[in-house]
Amino acid sequence: MDRIVASRCRYDLVHLTNPLPRTIKAWRVPIDNQRSKMTPFSTLIDGMQQNVDCHSISLPTDWLQGRTAYGGLSAALCLEATHRGNENLPPLRSAQYCFVGPATGNLNISAQMLRKGKSTTLVGCDMTGDSGLAVRSTLCFGASRPSSHHYQSLVKPQVAGPDDCPAYFNWTASPSFARHFDGRLAAGAMPRTNGAKPEMSVWLRHHDIGDETSMVRLLALADALPPAALVLATDPMPISTLTWSIDVLEAYPSNSTGWWLAQATCDTSREGYSAQETVIWSPDGKPVLVARQNVAIFG
């Protein structure tokens, strides 16, 4: 429990129209000035170093959730290190991440081949930091095979485009990393919306323009939203993701705009834990990723 407590992030979900407390003066700085001091995602990834038996990276404060890396970034870094250590991997099909402790300080990421078959490759990847083991993950890569099956039951939400939706990341004291993303609320509710269902559909994109077919970029973005259960919250509260499981539905997703629609739905929230599902949609209406997440909620 000590490690979980150390990785908590407090979501202070007060709208920007409310008076700003003196303790969060940084939000008085114009957004353009804030971004000029931030590390673009592409620069962050380029800073990963190869060592004898692992890859290492130190995170700038603007990419942190409290004092630790948030789950989506940790997942993305594990995938990047896995690709660098294993050439010619087929597309990522599935991954399971267990967030054991806070990802703080200099991070070392080691990937180990578990099994290589004719079409499927399994890799185990661990991330360690100053507090010890931070992430333990298993990644499954698979080449396409001929199949007589072509079916999917997911139905894309009928929502307006991002240009016609209001801004999403407009609350004070949100985690530092949220400033790296542009968000537009397409459906559902903002956190701390009294009486609303705990679900939201939000258009998301990186402020840093890059290769939008990159699964590493998509993983970092797919976990950018707060848990859908925080729609039910009445006060700010710390949260900590415990596990994150993803299934990739499009081997090579394409995107010409940079926008992805994240549809997050809380299934249950009780006894201090929330279970939710998130579906990531491409702008042309294709489901590209489905994720399940278990979150500890301290409030």
Predicted regions mapped to residue ranges:
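Short hydrophobic targeting helices and cationic amphipathic motifs
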Residues: 13-16, 34
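Terminal targeting signals and extreme-terminal segments of soluble enzymes
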Residues: 33-299
